Design a protein with these regions (language model features):
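Small-residue-rich hydrophobic transmembrane alpha-helices
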Residues: 58-119, 156-175, 282-346, 377-400
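Residue-level signal for short hydrophobic patches within transmembrane helices
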Residues: 17, 21-40, 44, 68-75, ...
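Short alpha-helical transmembrane segments in multi-pass integral membrane proteins
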Residues: 1-28, 87-152, 196-252, 308-373, ...
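Small-residue hotspots at the loop-to-helix junctions and early N-terminal turns
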Residues: 53-67, 142, 146, 205, ...
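Short runs within selected transmembrane alpha-helices of multi-pass transporters and secretion channels
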Residues: 80, 148-167, 175-183, 204-219, ...
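Transmembrane alpha-helix boundary and packing residues in multipass membrane permease domains
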Residues: 31, 35, 47, 85, ...
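Helix-terminus/linker motif at the lipid-water interface of multi-pass membrane proteins
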Residues: 36, 40-59, 129-136, 192-199, ...
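Transmembrane helical elements of multi-pass membrane transporters/channels
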Residues: 26-45, 148, 159, 182, ...
Length: 453
């Protein structure tokens, strides 16, 4: 039995030891492939409804509905990052007692939150769609999709919480295996429900929730079978106020940051909705296409958060600082490669989603206008992830909410109202990123732990 435990431990990346760039890549690639399959998982819905149902269904799944899901679920995912940071620090410090308390407190908190998030999403879906000025022909399918999605919120939140716990201890492989399985299952169910049984948006929503249920069950089973200190044991699931406080201290700012991001995106969606169904469909599809860039950037951000968290817990400040520099270089190399590919193949990529040439033309213009500025965000993503791993979350949240979210909203009402059009809307992204990136760099060099050493 002891031998099995040791074998299990060797499967977990030793983040506090070894060559930094190699250890970062060992941890990064499973997250990258995981986010890739997550993107394929999400994109399958859009491709199927776009090609086999119509542009109204495409707008329903990929437009305002996507924004609402990101707003409500994104807040909880931010809270999950709090659990991830706390557990990674305890794991790095080999504090077994507090790690167990944080893990089991996080799980019961997840159960309680799923009830609140699911209920709120179900009730508020239609009013928010109207508030966002969603085109009338899109609203019925959007409401149907959101009601089914939020009815299955429990599975989505459980998967996100357990996956964040596994990554916190350096296990980025098993969440990847789960995503591969559920991604293939989602594509199969999309084809069966939509192409064969002609269930439209209803079929896409049912396929999504079914796969979320499978993913939640699988990752929970992995955590229950773990032969290490992070094993989930149902009889130990209870609230520990100190652990909950530590999780919320880090998770709440991250959750609020996510909410502010999505409020800004919701506001942008309102302005986009005023430009008609073709632009709404193109913008929603753009969100699926540029997610290829975000999955790379976010994979590096998740990697550096866990990397900094464990080394911070172990007191290895020099290694922690060096890892940020290494991660930044790798993230920029990847960002330039992905951005170039998206710009070069913009037209054929859009044709994968829809045969409507008007939508394709609008979408290709969006990619070529906006994608070149995405590299600016890399600074924000990596530094924010590093600061979060060290437990520094309040000021980064303020910088993000003010520099990105608030400034973007001000731009929309101050500039876009007098200069209407999709180009004016998209310009809010690089303007807000440049200002926020400068603020993050200044804060990092002044306040990151160990910079004075």
């Amino acid at each position: 039995m002891k031998q099995n435990k040791n074998q299990k431990n060797t499967a977990v990346n030793q983040i506090t030891e070894g060559v930094i760039w190699k250890q970062l890549l060992i941890f990064f690639f499973p997250i990258l492939f995981g986010t890739l399959f997550q993107q394929i998982y999400n994109t399958a819905d859009t491709v199927v409804v776009g090609r086999f149902v119509g542009k109204e269904a495409l707008a329903a799944v990929g437009g305002s509905s996507s924004m609402i899901v990101n707003l409500i679920v994104g807040f909880f995912v931010g809270l999950c990052s709090g659990a991830s940071v706390v557990i990674s620090q305890f794991y790095g410090a080999k504090d077994h007692k507090n790690l167990k308390k944080a893990l089991h407190t996080s799980m019961i908190f997840c159960l309680a939150a799923s009830i609140i998030v699911g209920t709120a999403g179900f009730i508020l879906a239609e009013p928010i769609l109207h508030l966002m000025k969603t085109p009338a022909e899109v609203i019925p399918d959007s409401v149907l999709y959101l009601h089914i999605y939020f009815a299955g919120t429990f599975f989505n939140l459980v998967y996100n919480m357990v996956s964040s716990i596994l990554r916190a201890v350096g296990d980025s492989k098993r969440p990847l295996y789960v995503l591969i399985i559920t991604c293939l299952l989602n594509i199969l169910l999309d084809v069966v429900f939509v192409v064969i049984f002609h269930m439209g948006v209803l079929g896409v929503a049912l396929a999504t929730v079914s796969c979320q249920a499978v993913s939640a069950i699988l990752v929970t089973w992995f955590l229950m079978r773990a032969e290490d200190i992070y094993r989930l044991e149902f009889h130990e699931i209870r609230f520990d106020l100190r652990s909950l406080g530590a999780v919320l201290r880090i998770g709440l700012p991250a959750g609020l940051e996510s909410v502010m991001y999505n409020i800004a995106n919701l506001t942008i969606q309102i302005f986009v909705n005023e430009l008609g169904t073709d632009t709404v469909a193109a913008w929603g599809t753009m969100g699926k296409i540029d997610a290829v860039f975000w999955m790379v950037c976010n994979a590096f951000a998740i990697s550096i958060t866990t990397f900094v968290g464990q080394n911070y817990g172990a007191g290895k400040y020099h290694r922690m600082r060096k890892s940020v520099r290494v991660c930044m270089v790798m993230a920029y190399i990847s960002a330039f490669i992905v951005s170039g590919a998206l710009i070069l193949f913009a037209n054929p990529i859009y044709h994968l989603f829809t045969t409507d040439q008007v939508v394709v033309d609008i979408g290709v213009h969006m990619i070529r206008f906006l994608i070149p500025s995405y590299a600016i965000y890399v600074v924000i993503g990596i530094i924010s992830g590093a600061l979060r791993g060290a437990g520094r979350v309040l000021v980064p949240m303020i910088l993000t909410c003010g520099g990105v979210c608030l400034l973007r909203i001000i731009w929309l009402f101050a500039f876009v109202r007098s200069h209407p059009g999709i180009d004016s809307i998209m310009l809010s992204y690089p303007v807000s990123w440049i200002i926020t990136a400068v603020l993050f760099v200044i804060y990092y060099f002044r306040r990151f732990p160990g910079m004075q050493l």
